[in-house]
Structure formats: structure tokens, C-alpha cells
Amino acid sequence: LSTLPPTADDAPGRAVRVGTALGLCSAVGYTVANSALRDVSRPDDFAWSLWVTLCKSAPVATAAWAIVAVRALRGRKALPSFAVWPRLMAAGVLAQLGGNLMFQEALGVLGLALTVPVTFTGIILSGAALGRFVLGEPVGLRQGASIVLLIAATASLGMAAPDAADAVIAQAVAGANADPAAVAFAVATALAAGCAYGVMGVVIRGNTAQGVGVAGTLAPLSLAGFLSLSAFLLLKTGEIPLTSTPPEARLPLLLAGTANVVAFFCIAAALQRIPVVRSNLLNASQAAMAGVVGVVWFREPPTLWLLTGTALTIAGLALLGLRRPRSIRARLSGRPREETFAEAVETV
């Protein structure tokens, strides 16, 4: 192995490797978080979904503002210009109410193995479209083919939705069956959640590409989302059910929040280094992970459609590969080196 330091010419390649590693770490973190969320999911309990989503979002806001505070005390630029705050805060509200909350609702009907890949259809399509037309990021042939495979995977997994929903509902209410209309609505909800996540990803990348650090970008975004969830919960129930949370749900909620904050920072840092489409496709590996966890741990039915969809997901990610197209490397080579996730944490 060479001990020579990397040259300036290798900077784009290093950015690709860092971004790829962060994207994969985010996938693992979100799989852990989503598994914990699946453990506490309840069908037809919107107020509970609000509370679970609030618990999930709180650590992100806390960590982001803690980093911002320390950076400010050290005299470093901590927050973006107030001119971009409305955009970030709107994305934060959309990500929580349209993303995390809808995702939690879908989990209570579809289960883990189906909700995650269906959500990624929305993420990939919205991220690809907005990345192309808003950020000017090209969608190459391999990425386009990967998108097609992942959409086919989601379609295959969607065919298993009725059986999966019956199993999930039966676990919550003995002998009950899922309403077909509720199943269709849950699929639409998961797709909508993915679109909300896709918009958030483009907003994060659009601002970090302008020199705004990870924590500075996430601080106003996560705060707006947390406040909107809190207000919605108070309007819905009139209370914040901190003391009334069942003891058996507290550890999964803590695990979900902790894993979510790690995954959130990883994906935000990855979006600094690699295009939205590539980051989303790497992070989509959690679809395969969710399928395994859903079947093995939560006893969701391992149908042929589920196995086919998981295989298509793996094929789509394998096609993507780990090398960045030359055109993207060339575009990055003239840019100054940006802050990595490790630097965002270590240099606060």
C-alpha cells in the first residue's frame, strides 16, 4: 500500500469514496431506525404516529444546534444566510409532516419490508427529476437503468402489499384483515413520503454546495420540522405524552432517534460530495436490508414477489457501481474541497 498523501488530482475521487461510504452508513443507520419504528408502529393511530415521529426528529434538531452553538463560540461561521432560511424551514416542515409522519403511518399498515422500497420509488424519482432540473446534475445511462430496476423492484414488492398488510394488521388485532382501500392509501402515503424526502435532499445539496456546512443546513431545517410536529401534536391531542409513553416503547423510540440522527448527518454529508441520484441509489440499499429484517424479525410474509423485488433492488445497486462518471469528476475537480461529516463533528 502506498504511503504517499493523495494529490490534488485525486480530490474528486476521494470525494466519491467519502460520499459513497457516508451513503452506505446512512442506509445502515436508517435500517436500524426504521426497524425500531416498525416495532412501535400502530395501525389507525394517527396521534401515536405523531408522537413517534416527534421522538424520532428531536435528536436531529438537538445535535444540529449543539454543533452550531459550539462552532459559534469558536468564532466560526455556524449558520447559513437568513435569506435561505425560508427555503430550509419549508423543506423541514415538508420532510417531517409529508415525509416522516406519512412514513410512520404506512409502516403501521404495510410493514417494514414493503414501506421502505415503496418510499424509495418516490425518493429516487423526485430526487432524479429535481436534481436534473434544479441542480443541473446529469442522470447517466447506468443511473437511469438502476432507476428502472429499482422501480421494477418496488412494483414487485407492491404486489405483496395485500398479504403483508394482512400479516401486519393481524399482529396488531388478532383475526383482523386489512381493508383494500387502506392498503392502497398506505402505498400512496409511502410514495408521498418518498417525494417529500427527495425534495429535502435536493434542498440540502443545493445549500451545502454553496458552502454551508452540514450542521448549519440541518439546524433551521430540523428545528422547523420539530416545531411543526409539536404544534400538530398539541392541536391533535392537547398534550405531549412524555410520561404516558408505554415503558416497552421507550427503548425502541430512543434507538430510533439515535440511529436516525447518525443516518441523517451521514446522508446530509454524502449529499455534499456526490449527486442526489447517486446518493439516493446508494442509500436505497436499505430496501434490501429492510426486506430481510421485516421477514426474519417481524415475521412479515416472504412471498415470491418480495424475493423478486429484493433481487431487483440488489441488481439495481450493483449496476450503479462505485465509480463516478468522468463528467462528474471533471465537474468536481474545479471546486474547493468541502466539509466532510467527520470534519463537521471533529472541528466543532
Q: What is the predicted function of each stretch?
A:
Residues 2-55, 165-206, 227, 332-348:
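Glycine-/small-residue-enriched transmembrane alpha-helix faces in small-molecule transporters
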Residues 2-3, 45-98, 149, 195-200, ...:
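Transmembrane alpha-helices of multi-pass small-molecule transport proteins
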Residues 18-26, 74-102, 185-193, 242-262, ...:
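Loop-to-transmembrane-helix transition segments
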Residues 21, 55, 113-122, 206-224, ...:
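Helix-helix packing/entry segments at the starts of transmembrane helices
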Residues 31, 35, 93-97, 101, ...:
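Hydrophobic/small/kink-forming positions within alpha-helical transmembrane segments
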Residues 40, 52, 106, 118, ...:
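Hydrophobic/aromatic residues within transmembrane alpha-helices
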Residues 64, 142-176, 305-324:
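Hydrophobic transmembrane alpha-helices of multi-pass small-molecule transport proteins
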Residues 123-148, 155, 288-307:
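C-terminal transmembrane-helix exit sites in multi-pass transporters
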